[in-house]
Amino acid sequence: DSHRRQRQMCIRDRTSTLQQAASSKLGFGVSRTMRVAQKLYEAGRITYMRTDAPSLSNDSIEDARLFIKDTLAEEYLTEKPRIYSGKENAQEAHEAIRPTSASLTPEKLSGHSEEEVKLYDLIWRQFIACQMPDAKYLSINAKVVLDDYVFSARGREVIFDGYTKISSQNAKKADEENLPSLEEGQVLKLVEVKNEKKFTKPPARFSEAALVKE
């Protein structure tokens, strides 16, 4: 059983979403994220880091699109520029948090601490990915019959990686695995059987990222 799906890039970086991403992906607390972002801003590497706006300037959008076209391929560029707008009452004196130059990749960032490079990498990838197309894949639910036993597997087959080529955001759910192409009635070779004991877990405690989201 399979069906096609698309996964979209999430909205551009605002202060709250940057704090959430830095907490979940880098283990940074809110105050640490803002301290590191302040250093990047003062060094002229990123735009102002206190903003409610997901919007981007036309020049920055063109900058990202030129980078994608020159360094990746035409297929990784959306047909039209993606424009992001904020909520009606959002404070949009500043645009979304982004690098000041798309061509300044994390690998080229010099004279900065490890934590600054890590946060910059997060911001840069989010910025570039926002002008890339959706990821496309087949969602697969497979049942494998072995004698009197039926084994189930849930996963996906990637058709086109899209924005996930540069950003792992929303690339795969925790219970999904990349599966090879399968056909109904196909004979498979048993390689290994593992018996694993698993337990359900209580809801996780609130992290700083979860509190910011709330």
Task: Tell where the protein language model's regions lie, with residue ranges.
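Short amphipathic alpha-helical interaction segments
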Residues: 28-39
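Single conserved hydrophobic/aromatic residue that forms the stacking wall/gate
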Residues: 1-11
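Alpha-helix C-terminal capping/helix-coil junction sites
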Residues: 23, 41-42
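Extended, highly charged linker/hinge segments and catalytic-adjacent loops that couple domains
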Residues: 43-121, 152-195
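Short acidic, hydrophobic short linear motifs in intrinsically disordered regions
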Residues: 12-22, 47-51, 202-214
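Active-site phosphate-binding and catalytic loops of NTP-dependent enzymes
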Residues: 30, 74-81, 128-136
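Long, charged, helix-prone linker segments
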Residues: 137-155
